[in-house]
Amino acid sequence: MAATLLAARGAGPAPAWGPEAFTPDWESREVSTGTTIMAVQFDGGVVLGADSRTTTGSYIANRVTDKLTPIHDRIFCCRSGSAADTQAVADAVTYQLGFHSIELNEPPLVHTAASLFKEMCYRYREDLMAGIIIAGWDPQEGGQVYSVPMGGMMVRQSFAIGGSGSSYIYGYVDATYREGMTKEECLQFTANALALAMERDGSSGGVIRLAAIAESGVERQVLLGDQIPKFAVATLPPA
């Protein structure tokens, strides 16, 4: 049965006998944060959000992953793609940005952090599987959101979504987002969008992690299962 599953998943011809015939598919897959990530800009800061499911093939490797990674005091990134790739890139950018801040003797710009992600993702675009959203606050530009998808492009947006679950919520976010939302409205908007994606996307799930970044600092919160927004799901009537 396992051999049949491996062949069906495109892992090559199924071995007739031997240990490979009984190896589950997730043992040969890399750990992935196939996921839903999001960031929204408001007047005075940004809100970031992500689900917490990490998968290895069809196996859920971690239910409570933290995909909101601090890069500096008021700069965070949301990670999607290969867990190993995104963690390595985030660690490298954190290291470089720390030195840059020491040289300037002042907090780094969000644009600088996004540019470092862009340079690394573009330089190693053939080897990396990493889609990243960078968001934060700095004294020059205030709250900012940058998207760096796979391939190394960088674009500033009022809001950004990414990951496997994002394809299910483009219609919702386009119809719901409006300029001038408050921090509380952005938090609710982000939580609703993530909940909708987690309902439909098998690679997204767990809890919802949120972060609000402003001049005053970073406020983080976690929405557990009974706190996640609920939406009606279409079902067939009973026979």
Curated annotation (Swiss-Prot):
Name of this protein: Proteasome subunit beta type-6
Enzyme kind, highest EC tier: hydrolase
GO MF, one example: endopeptidase activity
Prosequence residues removed at maturation: 2-34
SUPFAM superfamilies attached to this UniProt entry: N-terminal nucleophile aminohydrolases (Ntn hydrolases)
Residues annotated with N-acetylalanine modification: A2
Classification via InterPro entries: Ntn_hydrolases_N (IPR029055), Pept_T1A_subB (IPR000243), Proteasome_bsu_CS (IPR016050), Proteasome_sua/b (IPR001353), Proteasome_suB-type (IPR023333)
Gene Ontology BP annotations: proteasome-mediated ubiquitin-dependent protein catabolic process
Stored PANTHER family: METALLOPROTEASE TLDD, PROTEASOME SUBUNIT BETA
Record's function text: Component of the 20S core proteasome complex involved in the proteolytic degradation of most intracellular proteins. This complex plays numerous essential roles within the cell by associating with different regulatory particles. Associated with two 19S regulatory particles, forms the 26S proteasome and thus participates in the ATP-dependent degradation of ubiquitinated proteins.
Domain of life: Eukaryota
Reactions accelerated catalytically: Cleavage of peptide bonds with very broad specificity
Pfam families from the UniProt entry: Proteasome (PF00227)
Cellular component GO terms held in the UniProt record: cytoplasm; cytosol; extracellular exosome; mitochondrion; nucleoplasm; nucleus; proteasome complex; proteasome core complex
Keywords of this entry: Acetylation, Cytoplasm, Host-virus interaction, Hydrolase, Nucleus, Phosphoprotein, Protease, Proteasome, Threonine protease, Zymogen
Species the sequence originates in: Homo sapiens (Human)
Main subcellular location: cytoplasm
PROSITE patterns: PROTEASOME_BETA_1, PROTEASOME_BETA_2
Compartments where located: Cytoplasm; Nucleus
UniProt xrefs under Gene3D superfamilies: Glutamine Phosphoribosylpyrophosphate, subunit 1, domain 1
Enzyme Commission (EC) number: 3.4.25.1
Residues carrying Phosphothreonine: T69
Upregulation: Down-regulated by IFNG/IFN-gamma (at protein level). Up-regulated in anaplastic thyroid cancer cell lines.
